[in-house]
From Swiss-Prot:
Species whose genome carries this gene: Actinobacillus pleuropneumoniae serotype 5b (strain L20)
Keywords: Amino-acid biosynthesis, Cytoplasm, Diaminopimelate biosynthesis, Lyase, Lysine biosynthesis, Schiff base
Subunit structure comment from the entry: Homotetramer; dimer of dimers.
Compartments in which it is found: Cytoplasm
Enzyme class: lyase
Catalytic activity, EC: 4.3.3.7
Binding site for pyruvate: 48, 206
GO molecular function annotation: 4-hydroxy-tetrahydrodipicolinate synthase activity
Protein name: 4-hydroxy-tetrahydrodipicolinate synthase
Source superkingdom: Bacteria
Organism taxonomic ancestry: Bacteria, Pseudomonadati, Pseudomonadota, Gammaproteobacteria, Pasteurellales
The encoding gene: dapA
Gene Ontology process terms (BP): diaminopimelate biosynthetic process; lysine biosynthetic process via diaminopimelate
Residues annotated as the enzyme's active site: 136 (proton donor/acceptor), 164 (schiff-base intermediate with substrate)
Amino acid sequence: MATPLFHGSIVALVTPMTHGEVNYEELKKLVEYHVQAGTHGIVSVGTTGESTTLSIDENVKVIKKTVEFADGRIPIIAGTGSNATSEAIILTKLLTNSGVAGCLSVVPYYNKPTQEGMYLHYKAIAESTDLPQILYNVPSRTGSDLKPETIGRLAEIPNIVGVKEATGDLTRLPLIKKLAGEDFIFLSGDDATGLESMKLGGQGVISVTNNVAAADMAKMCELALAGKFDEAEAINQRLMALHHDLFIEANPIPVKWAAYKLGLISEPNLRLPLTTLSESAQPTVLAALQKAGLI
């Protein structure tokens, strides 16, 4: 089977801010960091990119700027999810001719639709564009679980090409592959189980850890996809503390602080209601960076 466009280590990119406003010069530097490190793709304005506290205009501008800075060297996946189908369609249409390689759309959050509601939500979005669509299932945040059976139904829609599964439940992977087909792209949304998912046939991971360990994550995924699991595991174990401790507080709070400590961004700040990493949690994240050999 040919290597899919969406594979390997795909960073769920932070959105750098200075005094509460998006810092586009730093965004350009982050994109360059990932291009040079060998990152296989960038998700722009997903959960880690603070999508919920950016306006639609800001969402679109950040994504378009990310495409501009990447200049065709790395595929950009636009975060276009919403818990209102109409808004998700608007955002998707605004980006249809922007140069993005595809869209990542989170399961509608808070309003807790049924499986049929989720199916119709994604069907409507997919029918509004020719862009490839990646489903995003993260029940811990949305309050709703997109079941494998529903994913299988959605896989019949031509431009729904894959899923980001952030449940961490590896038993779902073979079932999703069975229901959706072997060509349906499975991307782990859980760094701690990302390598294990690739051992089971997953194609990669949409990673938070990648923000601060881009070269290591790219190498780990390349080794795993080549079947060199022992070598990949050695890297994975060195990063395991980061995989866990970057979630010591709600993402992206810890990873922005970690990126700040490494000098990748000039401020660790986020937009309210998210706040900077608490002082009590900072030693834990610092220790994880040290274990990973990044400091």
